[in-house]
Amino acid sequence: MYRNLITTNPNVMMGKPVIAGTRITVEHILEELAAGSTTDELLEAHPRLTREAIQAALAYALDLLRTMKAAS
């Protein structure tokens, strides 16, 4: 689901995963949601962001956690 929406590039945001075509990191989206921001607030603050991209960031984080758990 997220593979076309989340990209990494060592020359963009120090290689952190970002929403494709932006400099919005997955980390930033997760931090905002964890701090209590709503999806609508994120969309208002970042006009290039979409609901699909926010869902992709969550799916990416979940996949990463599952990968880490499987490796331990």
What are the residue ranges of the model-derived segments?
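Basic, low-complexity segments
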Residues: 1-13
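Short Lys/Arg-enriched helix C-cap and helix-to-coil transition segments
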Residues: 68-72
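Amphipathic, hydrophobic secondary-structure cores in small proteins
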Residues: 17-60
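Hydrophobic, amphipathic alpha-helical faces that serve as interaction scaffolds
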Residues: 64-65
